[in-house]
Structures are given as structure tokens and as C-alpha cells.
Amino acid sequence: MPTAFSLSRISTNVRFSASALLFPDLATAVAERMFLTPPRTRDAAASALDLVDARSSFLEHKGRHIAMWRWGSRESPAVVLAHGWGGYAAQMRAFVFPLVQAGYRVIAYDQPAHGVSEGRLTGLPDFADVLAEVAGIHGGVAAVIAHSLGGAAAALALANGKASFKKVVLVSPPSDLVGYSRRFARWYWMPEAVRKGMQAAIEERYGVRWENLEVPRVAPRLSAQALVIHDRDDRLMPWTHGATVARHWPGAKLMSTEGLGHRRILSDERVTRAAAEFITAR
């Protein structure tokens, strides 16, 4: 979701708000596409160059090629790195060395419609399915480190029985998708009726109700050990989200940081070290 207004954004919002009143069905369809279209910057595509020391490969998911990278020996237990909405695999790069040094194989990938992976539209159920496929193809996955929406995907993949991880590190995870959609709607001056229509359309597209995608709803029945790391100064995904997830996940540990925000937390040495120590602990 954008973080600042501009004259062009205001103009777009005015046109969208007007069309929502005159053509609500069209506005709902447009809103659905907007909500399922991640931002894809030039940096995201160029970021693959930061992963040249890894072995690259692709898997096919629903006709789309998903880019993957691997470090470490094939015989070693694996850790999967799952980035969040609008992100890309290279953002998780700082977690690689501590894990490889500890004897793990590390797998990163670009989510559908992100980075150099194919696609234009995607959503949380796709994230969960692709995470499960990546883990299944590589095998021997002991843990996952997931950022933002990637964390919700990890919880959903576990809850659906599509993946099995002994340990999960959730960095800045969301706890309230409906609340996020309401912020999204306010940003684009979207009437609540259109937002509800958008939610219904997305639920129909994926065949699942949104409340069944919420991490606090699925977490109580999960047995994987969890470490939740969240920054108190995160303005995109407030700290209360991570605290809520940790409270609902049985036995979860909560690590709080300060001054890192939503993205710099991924490259902080204290965070990457804590994640590696949690995964390697017996």
C-alpha cells in the first residue's frame, strides 16, 4: 500500500470514489485487481543479481514460473526464506550466511507476481501454496523464516496440512487482514460497500473466507515452535500485530526491537542471529 499522497494519487482516488457511486460492480472488480496486484519495482528484478552465489532454478505453479535460489549442501536440513507482499528474495539475504555456517541448506524464492517470478495477480492463498510447493520440491525442510505476509502464508500452509515445519520464525507478521483491507479502502477513498464486494470476490476466487486466513485464528492448533520478531516502530505493520500472533500461537516467543521499522529489520544482525540461534537450538 502506498505511504504518501500525491496530486496524481488524489486524482485517481477522486475518480475511483466517483465510479464507485455510479458503477459499483465495476468498482468492485477494479478494487479486487488493485488489492491482488503487488507493487513490482525495477529494484526487485535487479535484486536477483544479489543472489548470483546461489544455485538458481524454477518451479511451475498454476502456469507461472517461480524463481528459486539455494545455498548449502543438498544433504543438509533446509530452511526456507519467504518474503512478504511487495518484497523479493534478496531482501532475506542477511539470514543466509548464519544458517549456512550452522550447517543448513537455505532456499529463497520470489513469490508469485514478485521479483523475477511470473504473474500479475496473487494473494495469501497463493503464497501459502507456493511455500508448500517450494518446501516439497526441495525436501528436508526443518524451518521457515518468513516476513510480513509470508508469515501468514507459513501459518496457513501449516494449518492446511500442506507443509510441515518444526520451527517457524515470523518477522513482522500480520494479524488482521480485514483491518488491512479497511486501511486499503480508506487510502483509495473506497466506500465500505465496495470493500465488502472486493472481499467477497476474493473469497470466491480462492474458495476460502477471510477469517480462516487470519493467523490468530489458525495459530492455536499449530504445533510448530514459533519465534515472532517485530519492531515497535513498524508503521506498515504495527507491533501489536506481532504481539497478537505470539499470544495466540502456543508457546511462541516474542522478540521486540526498536528503530528498525518494517524492512530494515530484515538486515539487522541481532535479528538474523536470533533467528539462526532459535532454529539451531535443540
Please place each PLM-identified region on the residue numbering.
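Catalytic histidine-centered segment of alpha/beta-hydrolase-like enzymes
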Residues: 260-272
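Alpha/beta-hydrolase active-site loop
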Residues: 121-142
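Hydrolase active-site cap/lid region
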Residues: 159-208
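An N-terminal hydrophobic leader/cap segment in hydrolases
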Residues: 2-58
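Gly/Ala-rich beta-loop-alpha elbow adjacent to hydrolase catalytic centers
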Residues: 145-154
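Conserved alpha/beta-hydrolase "acid-adjacent" motif
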Residues: 235-241
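Conserved alpha/beta-hydrolase
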Residues: 89, 96-118
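Short beta-strand/loop motif that positions the catalytic acidic residue
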Residues: 221-223, 228-230, 234
